[in-house]
Amino acid sequence: MAFLKDLYKNKVAKDLQKEFAYSSVMQIPKIEKVVINAGIGNAVADKKHLEAAISELTLITGQRPVETKAKKSIATFKLRAGQSIGAKVTLRGDRMWAFIETLFNIALPRVRDFKGISNNSFDNQGNYTLGIKEQIIFPQVVYDDVKSVRGFDVTFVTTAKTAQEAKALLVGLGAPFQKVRGDK
């Protein structure tokens, strides 16, 4: 079992219940899923870019992504409706916990001049979205095999009702947020 899953069950959940005074254990926020989305603009011109992105996401997540298709045709981008322009993966369960652990403990510290992840990327439903600029920060991706550096979005979907609850959950799991002035 993943270290973060044990940490959540044994420590973080109890700390959140005390901090927010939940009357039921079912009210304690948890991470439902992690969605990784990569939009590949170069895929319009050359399918090889999409195939490379799919293989890299498969290495990073341990799960094969599904291709995302364009909803509308846009002539200026030479894009037709139904054309594959990206890939996405939804992680749940043990793969989700393994990915979060890799992201927080290995990948993010490898980012150049890393000062922490943004505090402002929460939505009103308690979800958090993080942009990764380079896929090469993950240890599963071999630098020499990468043809072009591309980024992707990582969305943490939580059961938290507010951004404050979601941030407390992610901080408890070890998310490296930026220090706000006045914080220790």
UniProtKB/Swiss-Prot annotation:
One of its GO terms (molecular function) is rRNA binding. Disulfide bonds: none annotated. The gene is rplE. Keywords: Ribonucleoprotein, Ribosomal protein, RNA-binding, rRNA-binding, tRNA-binding. Belongs to the universal ribosomal protein uL5 family. GO terms for biological process: translation. Part of the 50S ribosomal subunit; part of the 5S rRNA/L5/L18/L25 subcomplex. Contacts the 5S rRNA and the P site tRNA. Forms a bridge to the 30S subunit in the 70S ribosome. It comes from Ureaplasma parvum serovar 3 (strain ATCC 700970). This is one of the proteins that bind and probably mediate the attachment of the 5S RNA into the large ribosomal subunit, where it forms part of the central protuberance. In the 70S ribosome it contacts protein S13 of the 30S subunit (bridge B1b), connecting the 2 subunits; this bridge is implicated in subunit movement. Contacts the P site tRNA; the 5S rRNA and some of its associated proteins might help stabilize positioning of ribosome-bound tRNAs. NCBIfam families: PRK00010.1 (NF000585). This is Large ribosomal subunit protein uL5. It comes from the Bacteria.
